[in-house]
UniProtKB/Swiss-Prot annotation:
Source organism: Salmonella typhi
Top EC class, one word: transferase
CDD domains membership: FMT_core_Met-tRNA-FMT_N, Met_tRNA_FMT_C
Residue segments, region C-terminal domain: 210-315
Catalytic activity entry: L-methionyl-tRNA(fMet) + (6R)-10-formyltetrahydrofolate = N-formyl-L-methionyl-tRNA(fMet) + (6S)-5,6,7,8-tetrahydrofolate + H(+)
Gene: fmt
Binding site residues for (6S)-5,6,7,8-tetrahydrofolate: 113-116
GO cellular component, one term: cytosol
GO-annotated molecular function: methionyl-tRNA formyltransferase activity
Keywords assigned by UniProt, alphabetized: Protein biosynthesis, Transferase
This protein's name: Methionyl-tRNA formyltransferase
NCBIfam families: fmt
Entries under HAMAP family matching the protein: Formyl_trans (MF_00182)
Length: 315
């Protein structure tokens, strides 16, 4: 292709690998791949390569795994590749200004939200958590700030009432490569039109924690149901019963008003375990006790009915 670009790709997880895969068939020249160092994983804590490294090595691409890009010798790794552009997708390392300025067309990033909404670490989860009607991907020109650069291209997708972070992740992993390939074409032929982010519309997608995922019964049933979908597959919403954590995979909202204190078990039937919240009733449908597989409320009641006596309160 005549407008082929020399591209450095920087990314680490599966989400990034899907973008690298799309680039490999786009006609551009991938001159190097940067990814995080191998990390211990699994029960044996064996060093495991990132999904991006696995794909890059499979395709015979040069792979670089610096712990940081701050040292000058590591910055030379980037400079020596003489790239037109660096594509960054969920890389996990900060790019110093010296690196951002090295490629002729700078560095571009695929971000999992419609910027300036949800800058930061957990945009997919926060869009669900907040009850947003849509999300998408933004391809942006990187600068030294956190997701503050000019926007080059956006693609939106609706958020459904069934979406979890897992399903939304897959949708955006399809959209991202489309937006990336389009943006690279525009950069190559000089038609890209950068648009500054409106600072008045900025929201921040804070990292998730296991403690935040603990169910707080004082919240509304609607908010809790969104949390359950937002925190799936990680860190998973959970509650504590008899000193052990029980994950909640699925729930529904019953809008009925209740005078019972938040956390009070109102009913436990094959239709679900109904619990009073700060507003409305949360109907627990699928749960997972520690060391067990996820199961329906009915199956859990068959073995642990004493956990869910109506009138008792969950912590």
């Amino acid at each position: 292709m005549s407008d082929s670009l020399r591209i450095i790709f920087a990314g680490t997880p599966d989400f990034a690998a899907r973008h690298l895969d799309a680039l490999l068939t786009s006609g551009h020249n991938i001159v190097g791949v940067f990814t995080q160092p191998d990390r211990p994983a699994g029960r044996g804590k064996k060093l495991m390569p990132s999904p991006v490294k696995v794909l890059a090595e499979e395709k015979g691409l040069p792979v670089f795994q610096p712990v940081s890009l701050r040292p000058q010798e590591n910055q030379h790794l980037v400079a020596d590749l003489h790239a037109d552009v660096m594509v960054v997708v969920a890389y996990g390392l900060i790019l110093p200004k010296a690196v951002l300025d090295m490629p002729r067309l700078g560095c571009i990033n695929v971000h999992g939200s419609l910027l300036p909404r949800w800058r930061g670490a957990a945009p997919i989860q926060r869009s669900l958590w907040a009850g947003d009607a849509e999300t998408g991907v933004t391809i942006m020109q990187m600068d030294v700030g956190l997701d503050t650069g000019d926007m080059l291209y956006k693609l939106a997708c609706p958020i459904t009432a069934e979406d979890t972070s897992g399903s939304l992740y897959n949708k955006l992993a399809e959209l991202g490569p489309q937006g990336l390939i389009t943006t690279l074409k525009q950069l190559a032929d000089g038609t890209a039109t950068p648009e500054a982010q409106n600072e008045a519309l900025v929201t921040h997608a804070e990292k998730l924690s296991k403690e935040e995922a603990r169910i707080d019964w004082s919240l509304s049933a609607a908010q809790l149901e969104r949390c359950i979908r937002a925190f799936n597959p990680w860190p998973m919403s959970w509650l504590e019963i008899d000193g052990q954590p029980v994950k909640v995979w699925q729930a529904s909202v019953i809008e009925d008003a209740t005078q019972s204190l938040p956390g009070t078990i109102l009913a436990a039937t094959k239709q679900g375990i109904q619990v009073a919240t700060g507003k409305g009733i949360l109907n627990l449908l699928s749960l997972q006790p520690a060391g067990k597989k996820a199961m329906s409320a009915q199956d859990l009641l068959n073995s642990r009915r004493e956990w869910f006596i109506p009138g008792n309160r969950l912590a």
